[in-house]
Regions:
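Hydrophobic alpha-helical membrane segments
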Residues: 1-249
């Protein structure tokens, strides 16, 4: 399995070209993106099983998103069943990837408990008031511990569903090659993360300015409309990352 090593400029191109792909096929890219989000939200709301079902479904449904983005790039118009394309792949192995991510994230949270006695977990669950921690310097250490565990898990998972379903890699190798590819391509991913951060700040500033100059309702309308563009753009960017790093399937 070969992973291309890309330059810094690809990080911004994934954002710009992702937006261009959405503009080319807004209906299809929006459908697969929001169907993915909606199904996972519904799965997570299931009593007792939701917190397990959603992570297991995540890699399976992500293949449907990638297939939809590939169809949009090729100019094809697939049916609505494309979101379930992952079930035509080795879906049991895909579910194992979801289990890996679930266990890895749980381990990251448990690791923070060893450092702060459950402070960060309490913030996440809403049992601790964030206002009471404004001057809490110890919050930095559990965050660093969480990042030290969660980042490698995310790197191993990032490309793994595509490597398994599109490039026919066993799930263990898919996790390894995903981590390897992310590590070798830290430069464009750094630019990608910084680009998204800058974009978020610029949009937040622009929306606040518009709300102050025109009408506060403008902010509400914009907050409703922006995800309709940004969410498909981000998913399209993920497809472009797979294509650029690993080449045509």
């Amino acid at each position: 399995m070969h992973a291309h090593i890309l330059g810094y400029s690809h990080g911004w191109r994934w954002i710009a070209d992702g937006f261009a792909l959405w503009r080319r096929a807004p209906a299809l890219t929006s459908y697969v993106s929001f169907a993915y989000v909606l199904i996972l939200l519904l799965a997570s709301s299931l009593p007792y099983l939701g917190q397990i079902a959603a992570p297991l479904l995540m890699p399976i449904l992500s293949i449907g998103v990638l297939e939809g983005m590939a169809a949009a790039e090729a100019g094809r118009r697939p049916g609505p069943e494309i979101i379930f394309a992952g079930f035509r792949a080795p879906w049991r192995s895909l579910a194992l990837l979801g289990a890996f991510q679930l266990v890895g994230n749980l381990f990251a949270v448990l690791a923070t408990v060893l450092v702060d006695g459950g402070l960060l977990l309490g913030l996440y669950r809403g049992t601790i008031d964030p206002a009471s921690l404004e001057s809490e310097p110890q919050l930095l250490w559990p965050l660093l511990v969480w990042l030290a565990v969660a980042l490698p898990v995310t790197m191993a998972y990032w490309f793994a569903p595509a490597l398994l379903a599109w490039y026919r890699q066993p799930w263990i190798k898919a996790l390894f090659f995903s981590f390897y590819a992310m590590l070798r391509n830290w430069r464009p991913f750094l630019v990608y993360a910084l680009g998204l951060t800058v974009l978020a700040f610029v949009l937040a500033f622009a929306l606040s300015l518009l709300a102050a100059l025109i009408h506060p309702y403008v902010l509400g309308i914009a907050l409703f409309l922006l995800p309709l563009v940004l969410v498909p753009t981000l998913f399209a960017g993920l497809y472009l990352q797979v294509r650029d790093v690993f080449g045509p399937r």
